[in-house]
Amino acid sequence: MSLEALFNPKSVAVIGASAKPGKIGYAIMKNLIEYGYEGKIYPVNIKGGEIEINGRKFKVYKSVLEIPDEVDMAVIVVPAKFVPQVLEECGQKGVKVVPIISSGFGELGEEGKKVEQQLVETARKYGMRILGPNIFGVVYTPAKLNATFGPTDVLPGPLALISQSGALGIALMGWTILEKIGLSAVVSVGNKADIDDADLLEFFKDDENTRAILIYMEGVKDGRRFMEVAKEVSKKKPIIVIKAGRSERGAKAAASHTGSLAGSDKVYSAAFKQSGVLRAYTIGEAFDWARALSNLPEPQGDNVVIITNGGGIGVMATDAAEEEGLHLYDNLEELKIFANHMPPFGSYKNPVDLTGMADGKSYEGAIRDALAHPEMHSIAVLYCQTAVLDPRELAEIVIREYNESGRKKPLVVAIVGGIEAKEAIDMLNENGIPAYPEPERAIKALSALYKWSKWKAKHKEK
């Protein structure tokens, strides 16, 4: 059954809605309203009556069965013991998809697993889908849908985020806002009683608003199916996975956290590799890669050019490129074009060192030439902040030149410096140009793009 109703519901019921700040039923109502959801919202609470949130008055229905119209999605926020009955009513009502926020099921052990299985059977009886239980909700920015108790102001963009951990997922939403990473969707999967990562991958594969997918997982329900689906999706869009529970202690923690069987870590690594999935080991690394993979075009060749104003960061970037197996373009005849943008003591050998005297004009000319050259396939622009050029001015130059070139090549930026450098990085990221405060991070993100692109080329025809 399609997941269309999960991401584009025409109406949403919040079962366990509340007008009391601090309650999850209040936070979900507030987020739906504040994020601009345009469908109908129906609060449901056994107490009935009327509630007012953000100046909007709502009639409260005592049961989902009392709602006169069709309900596409019902978000359940009642204590675990009431969930089976509420879900039965959702089925009778013809609700299509039910995110169950409530916890106290499979993660508690055998008894909880039995109840969870009953929920799945109820859902199947009515042809209904369940997300969760034990989740924080779902966001889909193209539909202005924020049915979570996480941050309200999620930035729209091309990255879909799937998280098995609730608290971490909410924290990651906050991180993306701070780091200027735009999201198409955020989905909390929790115990994955029904809808799992593979189902979501199938949806995002054909979702035109999603260019890359990032998953935090502790384990998979059906390893074979996940790998088969991931392999198909990877031929079209990149998937980055943070797989936790790598150690024995970590695996035990995962089991008590979301009821996941973590499985052998080596098996996961091998399976990811086969399926074209990029495995990240830290949150920072995953988002660094996601920036590049969700915003940049695929490289049309192996030649990378590094443009810098400082020998130091140029050398560090070169080391990182060598470690990652990237090929630095070394045709000196062609690299000579950069001599026009540097003093006589500069170096046009790759890395191209414009020297500490580099101003806006130097960078503008060098970036323009690199973007226009048919044999230069990817570009890393590095800048050590000096008094000669305000980093924000450099950001404007990069944005302008990249846009005017038609964004046909991958381009990453690293700016090392103070507060102005941070502002410049934010400007670039807001404009879909991956920018970082360290050269190695920029190079590794570019490398992730190459790894996926090469895997895809190898498997495309098979």
Swiss-Prot record:
Optimum pH is 9.0 (at 80 degrees Celsius). Optimum pH is 7.0 (at 55 degrees Celsius). InterPro entries: AcCoA-synth-alpha, CoA-bd, Ligase_CoA_dom, NAD(P)-bd_dom_sf, Succ_CoA_lig_flav_dom, Succinyl-CoA_synth-like. Its EC number is 6.2.1.13. Gene3D superfamilies: NAD(P)-binding Rossmann-like Domain (3.40.50.720), Succinyl-CoA synthetase domains (3.40.50.261). It comes from Pyrococcus furiosus (strain ATCC 43587 / DSM 3638 / JCM 8422 / Vc1). GO terms for molecular function: acetate-CoA ligase (ADP-forming) activity; ATP binding. Optimum temperature is above 90 degrees Celsius. This is Acetate--CoA ligase [ADP-forming] I subunit alpha.
